[in-house]
UniProtKB/Swiss-Prot annotation:
Catalytic activity annotation: K(+)(in) + H(+)(out) = K(+)(out) + H(+)(in)
InterPro entries the record matches: CemA
Protein name as catalogued: Potassium/proton antiporter CemA
The keyword Transmembrane helix belongs to this UniProt entry's keyword annotation: yes
Location, primary (coarse class): plastid
One biological process term in Gene Ontology: potassium ion transport
Lineage: Eukaryota, Viridiplantae, Streptophyta, Embryophyta, Tracheophyta
GO molecular function annotation: antiporter activity; proton transmembrane transporter activity
Alphabetical keyword list: Antiport, Chloroplast, Hydrogen ion transport, Ion transport, Membrane, Plastid, Plastid inner membrane, Potassium, Potassium transport, Transmembrane, Transmembrane helix, Transport
């Protein structure tokens, strides 16, 4: 009996920590090697439109500051030569910085794929342990009082679709964009932030109407009383 209880707990622990360990090991073992290879062997620089615009803006700002300083102090030709060298070094530094961001995106994307494969394999290979965990969760929820259940549902809905939820959605979607290598786009993110809470609110109300009203009408009454 103890062995049967230990195996699902081990499975749950591996679900939580194994993807994190794989991600950490992958970044530590291959991160520095990929950065070195990219900066020494890669002749082509991969920049999207937003990155190119950012680099150009920084270079233009650097040039404008120098030209303003030159107009005030009237530097000789030798200083102008140093300025051109400085512009060249600044350009290389900016490109390396953006390439490092791109490499970081590739590493994040690769580790996300690996973690997804691991979790998918777990779900197919250990159905029995997953069934036991599911039964434990259902039993735990069933033993809670209707008041605690209603309070938990109210807290969860306020976090996901409440007044302050757009800030959390914005952080989560921005993190998703960064991990999977998409260019940051404020318009798309704003559209998703304004759409997702509405979709989840609709799904949640449908779930209350179809499931909770049939399974536990008293829970629905308590929930509506708290919500009002």
């Amino acid at each position: 009996m103890e062995k049967k209880a230990f195996i699902p707990l081990l499975y749950l622990t591996s679900i939580v920590f194994l993807p994190w360990w794989v991600s950490f090991s992958f970044n530590k073992s291959l991160g520095s090697w990929i950065i070195n290879w990219w900066n020494t062997s890669k002749s082509e620089t991969f920049l999207n439109d937003i990155q190119e615009k950012s680099i150009l803006e920084k270079l233009i700002e650097f040039e404008e500051l120098f030209l303003l300083d030159e107009m005030i102090k009237e530097y000789p030709e030798t200083h102008l030569q140093k300025f051109r060298i400085g512009i060249h070094k600044e350009t290389i530094q900016l490109i390396k910085m953006h390439n490092a961001d791109r490499i970081d995106t590739i590493l994040h994307f690769s580790t996300n794929i690996i973690c997804f494969v691991i979790l998918s394999g777990y779900s197919f290979l250990v159905n029995e342990e997953l069934f036991i965990l599911n039964s434990w969760v259902q039993e735990f929820i069933y033993n809670l009082s209707d008041t605690i259940k209603a309070l938990s549902i109210l807290l969860l809905t306020d976090l996901c679709i409440g007044f302050h939820s757009p800030h959390g959605w914005e952080l989560m979607i921005s993190s998703f964009y960064k991990d999977f290598g998409f260019a940051h786009n404020d318009q798309i993110i704003s559209g998703l932030v304004s759409t997702f809470p509405v979709i989840f609110d609709t799904i949640f109300k449908y779930w209350i109407f179809r499931y909770l009203n049939r399974v536990s009408p008293s829970l629905v009454v308590i929930y509506h009383s708290m919500n009002d």
